[in-house]
Amino acid sequence: TLMFSFIQANCGRGRAATIELGVRLRRSESMFALVQEPYLGGDEMDVLPEGMRVFTDRRGKAAILVDHQEAICMPVETLTTDYGVCLVVKGSFGSIFLCAAYCQFDAPLEPYLRYMDAVLLQASRTPAILGLDANAVSPMWLSKLSRHAEGQANYRRGELLSEWMLEARVAALNQSTEVYTFDNHRATSDIDVTIVNEAASMWATYEWRVDEWELSDHNIITVVAEPTTARSVESIAPVPSWNFSNARWRLFKEEMVSRIAELPENFSESPLDQQVSTLRSIVHSVCDTALGRKLTRSPSRRARWWTADLCAARREVRRLRRLLQDGRRRDDDAAVELVVVELRRASAYYKKLIGRAKMDDWKRFVGDHADDPWGRVYKICRGRRKCTEIGCLRVNGELITDWGDCARVLLRNFFPVAESEAPTAIAEEVPPALEVFEVDTCVARLKSRRSPGLDGINGTICKAVWRAIPEHLASLFSRCIRLGYFPAEWKCPRVVSLLKGPDKDKCEPSSYRGICLLPVFGKVLEAIMVNRVREVLPEGCRWQFGFRQGRCVEDAWRHVKSSVGASAAQYVLGTFVDFKGAFDNVEWSAALSRLADLGCREMGLWQSFFSGRRAVIRSSSGTVEVPVTRGCPQGSISGPFIWDILMDVLLQRLQPYCQLSAYADDLLLLVEGNSRAVLEEKGAQLMSIVETWGAEVGDCLSTSKTVIMLLKGALRRAPTVRFAGRNLPYVRSCRYLGITVSEGMKFLTHIASLRQRMTGVVGALARVLRADWGFSPRARRTIYDGLMAPCVLFGAPVWYDTAEQVAAQRRLASCQRLILLGCLSVCRTVSTVALQVLGGAPPLDLAAKLLAIKYKLKRGFPLEENDWLYGEDIACLSWEQRKTRLEECLIQSWQNRWDDDSEPGRVTHRFIPYVTLAYRDPSFGFSMRTSFLLTGHGSFNAFLHGRALSDTTACACGDPYEDWMHILCACPLYADLRDLDGLGVQRLGENWIFEGILDDQEKTQRLAMFAEEVFLRRRAL
C-alpha cells in the first residue's frame, strides 16, 4: 500500500513562515502543501527550497506546493481563479484533485461555495481533497466552541458551510485535538477545514493531526492517507543522461572499439533495426563505464542555512507558547499578559533570524555564481528551471483531467491525421555509394549539447562514437542508403510541449507547440539525405530568405522596403499570409512527389523515412504514443528542407504577378496598383494562387491572421480583399519577422513597444543585477550586451532611420533607462545620459546606427549621407579596420552628447569626463553608496529636500547645504575618513578636480571604502 501525505497551513503572508513551511515540507514525508496566504515576493530560491514547484490562485491568496519529483502535476486553469487553486496530481498513489482556498473573513462565503461546487463537479468520481481556511467554526469539523460562539460571525459562516457540506455530500477530515488550528495569543478557534468528496472518502483512511507552529497565527495540519487498496505501479525508465564533467574519452574510445570487435562477423548483414538497437545498447554501456550515469537524486532534506541560533530561538518560542497555554488553562490573566509580551518579542526575533539566514544563503548562492552570467542564477530568475507541466485541456467544451488523455490530445494537435496514405515510391536509379566525408561533414555540424531523443545520446556522444568507430557507423549509414530503409527507432521522437506565450489559454491545445527531440544518429542520416538532394537541387526563388545560408531577417526587410520605395504605382498593399499549422499539415505524398520532380536518387530511403513514424510523450507515470502520418517534424534536419522545396513552387507561381518576401512560412505579398479596385482584384487573384497551392500540399490559411495593410499611399476607405468567402482583415500595424510595421512603412510603433517588451526581462533579473552582492560587473555587462541590447536592437538595420526622429530617440532612451536602472546600483532619479556612461552602454539610437552601417558594409550596400564613413575612402581598409573606424565614430558622437553642458548628469561628468571609461572596461563597477557620490543623487539633505524627503538642506555639522561635494571634500564629521590626496582630488582656485579618481583601481577602491564608511556613520548620526 502506498502512503499519501500532505500539509495544510496558513502562512499569514509572512516571509519567515513561508520559508519555514518549505523547510518542513522538504524534511517531512509529505509530498504537497495546501497553503493559504503565502508570501509570494522575492526570488524562488530566496523563499522556497530549490526544485519545489508552486501553483497559486490569481490573487496570491492560496497556493499548492509540490515537493514530489515523480508526481505529474496538471493545473486546472478553469478552476484556478480568485477563489482558489486546483491541481490534478498523478503518481504511484493514483490520481487526485487537490484544491487550496482562503475564504476571506470580510468577504461573502457564497462565491467560495460556488467555486467548490465547480471543483467537485469537475472531480466527479476522482478523489478530491480541499484545504480551506474557512474563517468559520462548526461542530461538523469538531471546532472547540465556547458557550458564546453562536452569536459570532464565524459561527454563522460555519452554519452556511455546514449546510453546503451536507448538500454536496462531502466530509471533513478534522479530528478532535487539544491544539487549536488558529491561535494568535488573543483568541483561539478551529477555522481550518480539510474536506474530501465521496470518492476520496472511499479511496483511503486518514490520519489528521494539528502540530503547533511558532511562525503563524495558524498551526500546521498534517494529513496522512492510507489507500484502502494497493496499486501496482509501472516503473517508467527515464531518458538516460550522463556526467560529462569527468568524462574519460580515451577509455570511451577503447571500450567502443572493444565492444564492436566482439560482434559476430556476419553482424553487418543482420536486420538494420537490430543493428541500431545493438549500437544503442553498446553506446549506453560504454557511457556508463566512461562517463557515469547521471542519477536523479532527491533534493537534500537538510536546509544548509539552518543554524544553532535558529534552533535556540525556536525552542524559546515553543517554551513561551507552552507557558501561554498553561496560563490560559489556569485562567491566570496576569501571567498570560506577561507571557504574550515575551512571546511576541521572541516570535519577532525568530522570524527576523529566519529571514536574515535565508537571505544570507541566497546572497551566498548568487555570489558563488556571480561570474557566470548564463548559469543557475540567471535560469532561476528567468524561470528557465521551472518544469513545463501539461495542464488540463478543454476539448469541445469539456475539460480533460487525465494525463494520458491530455497527452494524446496534444499529440493529435501536433500531428494531424492525413486523409490519404502516402503513395509507394519506387527508386528509379541506384543511389551513389556513401563517402566517408559525407558522414564526417554531417557529424561535425551536430550541436553538441542539444537535448537528446529517447535514447539519451546527444551530439557530444555521437561525435565520440564517430571518432572511435567511423568504419562501423559509415557501414551502417551506407547500408541504410543502399537498402532504402530508415530504421524505425530513429523515426520516433520524444515530444516536448511548450506554451506559445504567457498570454495563451493553457486549457486550449492550440496554445502549445510540440518540439520533436529525435535520436542523434537519425539526424546524421537525415543530414546525409538532405545534402544529397541539395546537390541536384536547382536554384530556388531568390526571395526566400529563410533556410538560406548567409541570409537573414534584415535581408528580407531590405527587399520589402526597396520594393515599396521603388514601386511606380500609387499604392502598395501588403498581404501578410499566415498558414495554419504550416509545418504540421504537409502531406507526405506532396513531399515525395516534389522530391521525385527534383531528381532525387534516394527515393526509397525518403519513402521509408515518411512511413511508420511515431511520436511519444513520456513522463514518470506513463508513455503515450501516436502514429504520425503527415507534417514536417519540427526539430528534425529535414523538416525545414521539405517545407522549403514545397514552398518554392508557390513562390515561383507568385513571382510573375507581384513582388514578395518569404522567410520560412512567413509570406508577404506586395500588391501594386493605382486604384483600390486594382488592389482588390490583384489581391484576390494572388490569394487564389496561394489557396490552390495550399490544397495541393495539405496546408490551409488562417483567415483571421492573414491580414492586409497599405504600405504606400493612403485611401479614405481601406481595400477589401476577398478570400474564402470573406474579407481579409485590414490592420493599421502588423508584426512581420519580429518587427512591427505601421501603415506607410513606418516603424515608430515598433520602437514604442520595446520598453514594454523589456519590462518582464528586466524585472526578472533586476534583483541580482542591481544588488551589491549580486552578479559581478563583468557578468552584468555580459547580460546587457548578450541579452538586453540585442533584444532591443533586433532588426536595427530595418528601422534605424526612424531612430533619427526625436520622438523615437526619446522612446529608445526610455527603454534603455529601464534596462540600466535594472542593471546598476544607483538612485532611480539619475539621468539617462549618466546611466549610459556609468554602464558603458552607448545610446540605443547610436548603437542601432552602428549595426545598420555594419550591415550595409557587409552586404556591399551604398552608405547614405547621414551614415558614418559616408564619403570616406574605405576600400583599402580591412573589415577589422572598418569596425574600428565605426567604433571611433560611435564614441565621438556619444562623447559630443556627453560634453553638452545643457544635458543633465554634470556631477557624473566631473568624475567621468570620457565615455570610454566604463565602455572599455567591462569589470568597472560600484556600490550603491559609491553611486551617491558619483551621481550626486543619494542620501544628502540638499538632494532629499528638493524631493520633499527632508525638512532641511543643512548638514549635521552646521553647514547650510549638504550635498555630495560637501560630504566628499569639506564636512568635518568625516575628516578622519577623508584622504583627498590619496584619491587624487585636486583644487584649482574655487574648483575641485575629480576626473582622475576612477582612472586608478587603488583610488577607486579608496573612494568605495570612503563612501561605505561615510554613509554608515551618517546613518548612525
From Swiss-Prot:
Limits of the Reverse transcriptase domain: 479-741
UniProt key word Mitochondrion: no
Region (Gag-like cysteine motif) location: 955-971
Signal peptide: none
Biological process according to GO: DNA biosynthetic process
CDD domains per record: R1-I-EN (cd09077), RT_nLTR_like (cd01650)
InterPro entries according to UniProt: DNA/RNA_pol_sf, Endo/exonu/phosph_ase_sf, Endo/exonuclease/phosphatase, RT_dom
Any one GO MF annotation of this record: catalytic activity
Pfam families assigned to the protein according to its UniProt record, in alphabetical order: Exo_endo_phos_2, RVT_1
Keywords annotated in UniProt: Transposable element
Keyword Zinc attached: no
SUPFAM superfamilies hit by this protein: DNA/RNA polymerases, DNase I-like
Alphabetical list of PANTHER family matching this protein: REVERSE TRANSCRIPTASES
Protein name: Putative 115 kDa protein in type-1 retrotransposable element R1DM
